[in-house]
Amino acid sequence: MNSHATSHRGIGPEPHPFPGARPTTDGTARRTLLRTALTGAAALGAGLAATGTATADPGTAAPRPGTPDEALRELAAGNRRWRTYRERHPHENPAVRRTLATSQHPFAVVLGCIDSRVPPELVFDQGLGDLMTVRTAGEVLDEAVLGSVAYGVLELGIPLVVVLGHQSCGAVRAAVAAEQSGEHLPAHMQYLVDQIRPAIDHGKEGDARIDATVSANVRLVRSRLAAEPELAARTATGKLAVVGARYELTTQAVNRLA
């Protein structure tokens, strides 16, 4: 969600944003009916791949990332291109679009915030069919989000889930402010506050509390996802990594959170 910080894209060498995969938590059941309904495979006469590996898209030479490490490296390379104004805007040509009409092979699920300044496909310089993105204010989880992530991992064989928070998150700021004031937010926004509240860092004050809570919230959401039994089983076998990361509006860098 938007807060009042401004962003600009910096140029210059920065630390590698994803210094290696760290698998965190495989169900083998295949939900054919769900797969068919969500992709239109029945009408098109084509099913989805059961793994995250696939041949290179038309017009590209590199194969799709098929492991957590490969996926992390691709996201890191894409973010480097983004923050240095060297974007490729890959996988947008007519041949790719025709291929994607019958199947998809995304290599990462990105659970991010709805903030308009942090679109995952741009931040990681990826194109059509590369990322499965799920976005909620403050990366808040609910049943729809859990089901969406599970679909990507269990049905499409995606090897990487990234929980992506960001600097100056408005949802986090609102949660911190509501807790301090005791105000009950209108409509469904109170749900966001209730979900973010456990991550609030009471050891800091002011903007430092908000900033620390952004990172703490990412870690909390990541740990909840990693604890999902079917995701944990895939992680245990090395087929999946669930990681937390944070996007800095002022530098445009994505950095891995331990």
Model-derived features with residue positions:
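N-terminal export leaders
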Residues: 29-44
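N-terminal short beta-loop-beta anion/metal-coordinating cradle
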Residues: 89-125, 129
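Short HxH-centered metal-ligating active-site micro-motif
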Residues: 118, 122-207, 214
